Amino acid sequence: MRPLTPRQAEILELIKRNIADTGMPPTRAEIAKRLGFKSANAAEEHLKALAKKGCIEIIPGTSRGIRLTQANESEEELGLPLIGQVAAGEPILAQEHVEQHYQIDPAMFRPSADFLLRVRGDSMKNIGILEGDLLAVHKAEQARNGQVVVARVEDDVTVKRFEKKGSIVYLHAENEDYSPIVVDLTSESLSIEGLAVGVIRNGDWQ
């Protein structure tokens, strides 16, 4: 299946959720309303693109004439998971942390992405990681100095630039308004959850 644009992935996820919640696909008007399109025609164009990519079948003559293809009926085909709030002490990729999936080709990123994390705050704005963006993350447990990491400090998950000197780790913000987070590994807990490998801009999902 060809990779989807962010908007196409969002519409496909909406269709799947609607079917799961109500037992039927949404109408074009419902898609337009929920995603802020000016008209149902805009939704129709996206549906046609999804059909061309083999994600759905369009059934003529009915307002709810949308059918998922077999490849999209399986949860495993949903694509990259978007991670929401992470509970204390639990793996970041635990199923209960997954808000939804986006059909984005992991190979778009180098190294390939394993999950997406929604950016909160502006501590990394100077390198273009902005509030509301989706950060593509490659799962990793080790990092080199200078890499941008997703780190868990005690029970808080944060995105920062990694620097280690002996037993001290500095997690640097890319915003002069924020001081580094300093972690003494002899007395505090820190784990690397992954490496930032790309950003999907917030506006692409609106």
UniProtKB/Swiss-Prot annotation:
Residues 28-48 bind DNA. The active site is at 123 (for autocatalytic cleavage activity), 160 (for autocatalytic cleavage activity). The keyword Kinase does not apply. The record marks 88-89 as: Cleavage. One of its GO terms (molecular function) is serine-type endopeptidase activity. GO terms for biological process: DNA repair; DNA replication; negative regulation of DNA-templated transcription; proteolysis; SOS response. It comes from the Bacteria. Keywords: Autocatalytic cleavage, DNA damage, DNA repair, DNA replication, DNA-binding, Hydrolase, Repressor, SOS response, Transcription, Transcription regulation. Its EC number is 3.4.21.88. It catalyses: Hydrolysis of Ala-|-Gly bond in repressor LexA. CDD domains: S24_LexA-like. InterPro entries: LexA, LexA-like, LexA/Signal_pep-like_sf, LexA_DNA-bd_dom, LexA_repressor, Peptidase_S24_LexA, Peptidase_S24_S26A/B/C, WH-like_DNA-bd_sf. Pfam families: LexA_DNA_bind, Peptidase_S24. Homodimer. Represses a number of genes involved in the response to DNA damage (SOS response), including recA and lexA. In the presence of single-stranded DNA, RecA interacts with LexA causing an autocatalytic cleavage which disrupts the DNA-binding part of LexA, leading to derepression of the SOS regulon and eventually DNA repair. Belongs to the peptidase S24 family. This is LexA repressor. It comes from Shewanella sediminis (strain HAW-EB3). The lineage of its organism: Bacteria, Pseudomonadati, Pseudomonadota, Gammaproteobacteria, Alteromonadales.
